[in-house]
């Protein structure tokens, strides 16, 4: 059985650890609220872009943008979104597992893969497995910089437009609520006919929106022309989805970290209680032994 001094040292060590995890829990809770606000702030933008695009495409049915054209898949691009830091439970492990499964599936179908990594954890994974990296962006901080994200993803978008890849996927963690985050592997390009927002449930698709708008006889005045406006809108829409993927992951990261640190703090409290019980028993045993020795010595005299 460990001595009293050793147990006291362990209790002190666990108490110090609990102070750290408690502080990290509070910091994560504060960052989580801000990350959720940023994540939700981008959703109305995507919804409005979908509505405008629906109207434009209905008014110009003869025009087909490359982002909407299905083609035989021989090569794909994958954007893996992870965190830069750990201590967020199984967040990175879960999305890594899903991504590896999909990459194996592509390999079995003889489909070439080129990857973009957002976050140190994803970069480390793709490097270890020897994936073809065409771009990367790490140390994104607590607030994603759109210019940095677009700079990294431009390679993939250009390759898609030039036909070097036939589809573009994004692997990220979708924020459901504070206690639940789910890894998702979504096709970004070509866009589905409905232009569904992969990060919202119950949102109208482009097709449904177009159907609703079909009663209107008005139209926009285009400058310079409708096709140019559609091109710009779809480009902004895809960029917005990529930003949303990173924002969702950041909100998920802070939520998972807060939950993980709370769990660590609760476990530390339990360990302290167990150690305190052992300490009391050990101390009581030592006192009893000393009393017995004194009584035994007095009887011998």
UniProtKB/Swiss-Prot annotation:
Name the Gene Ontology molecular function terms of this record: ATP binding; proton-transporting ATP synthase activity, rotational mechanism
Stored Gene3D superfamilies: 3.40.1380.10, ATP synthase, gamma subunit, helix hairpin domain
What Pfam families does the record tag this protein with? ATP-synt
Q: How does it sit in the membrane?
A: Peripheral membrane protein
Keyword terms, alphabetized: ATP synthesis, Cell inner membrane, Cell membrane, CF(1), Hydrogen ion transport, Ion transport, Membrane, Transport
For this UniProt entry, which segments traverse the membrane? none
What HAMAP family does the record tag this protein with? ATP_synth_gamma_bact
What are the record's GO terms for cellular component? Answer: plasma membrane; proton-transporting ATP synthase complex
Protein name from the UniProt record? ATP synthase gamma chain
Say yes or no: keyword Glycosyltransferase present: no
Q: What does this protein do?
A: Produces ATP from ADP in the presence of a proton gradient across the membrane. The gamma chain is believed to be important in regulating ATPase activity and the flow of protons through the CF(0) complex.
Q: Which organism is it from?
A: Bordetella bronchiseptica (strain ATCC BAA-588 / NCTC 13252 / RB50)
* Highest taxon in the source lineage: Bacteria
Say which family it is in: Belongs to the ATPase gamma chain family.
Please give the subunit comment from the record.
F-type ATPases have 2 components, CF(1) - the catalytic core - and CF(0) - the membrane proton channel. CF(1) has five subunits: alpha(3), beta(3), gamma(1), delta(1), epsilon(1). CF(0) has three main subunits: a, b and c.
* Location(s), subcellular: Cell inner membrane
Alphabetical GO biological process terms: proton motive force-driven plasma membrane ATP synthesis
